[in-house]
Amino acid sequence: MVDTNNVKLRIENIVASVDLFAQLDLEKVLDICPNSKYNPEEFPGIICRFDDPKVALLIFSSGKLVVTGAKSIHDIERAVAKLIEKLKGIGVKFKRAPLIDIQNMVFSGDIGREFNLDNVALTLPNCEYEPEQFPGVIYRVKDPRAVILLFSSGKIVCSGAKSEADAWEAVRKLLRELEKYGLIEEEEEEL
């Protein structure tokens, strides 16, 4: 079995949808959110940027949000709490606590070895490789649902996971497939 101890994954982006359970007057919200834009003819929500935590929020009159750019779930929770405090300051009433739903997590990583992507693409099921269009193999994992981009350097990008555990499971499945088809050798133990 391939050892994943040498594989490193780092969160690059988390996208979450949020329901605040409150109706929002976007003109009033615009007044309390510096670093924001609102042009209803172009987009029906406010685009707001926070510096701490460093995230972008799409704020809609329905009280629904999209938070993106976060590097941790804690950053999303902090951003939502920060917005709620600002909204309370203009008299917004909330029916209940916010509901945060992680939609997508993107990780970058390194498997720690190089790959011949032509061999990978010809052998591995559930993958696509068109080097004229993109320099990596696109490997699709069904359960947990995720997409892994594998580059010849051994670097990877995993997207579509809803949790870090799902990302790790997707990477383990890729490594097992690479090993199963002889595209990666087990490291020999030193005597």
From Swiss-Prot:
> Sorted alphabetically, which PROSITE patterns does this protein's record hold?
TFIID (PS00351)
Recorded superkingdom: Archaea
- List, alphabetically, the Gene3D superfamilies matched: TATA-Binding Protein
Q: Which Gene Ontology biological process is one annotated for this entry?
A: DNA-templated transcription initiation
Keywords, comma-separated and alphabetical? DNA-binding, Repeat, Transcription, Transcription regulation
Question: InterPro entries from the entry?
Answer: TBP (IPR000814), TBP_archaea (IPR033711), TBP_CS (IPR030491), TBP_dom_sf (IPR012295)
Which GO MF term does the entry hold, naming one? DNA binding
* Renumbered ranges of sequence repeats: 11-87, 102-178
Family the entry assigns: Belongs to the TBP family.
The record's section on NCBIfam families has: PRK00394.1-2, PRK00394.1-3
Q: What does this protein do?
A: General factor that plays a role in the activation of archaeal genes transcribed by RNA polymerase. Binds specifically to the TATA box promoter element which lies close to the position of transcription initiation.
Record protein name field: TATA-box-binding protein
Give the originating organism.
Pyrococcus abyssi (strain GE5 / Orsay)
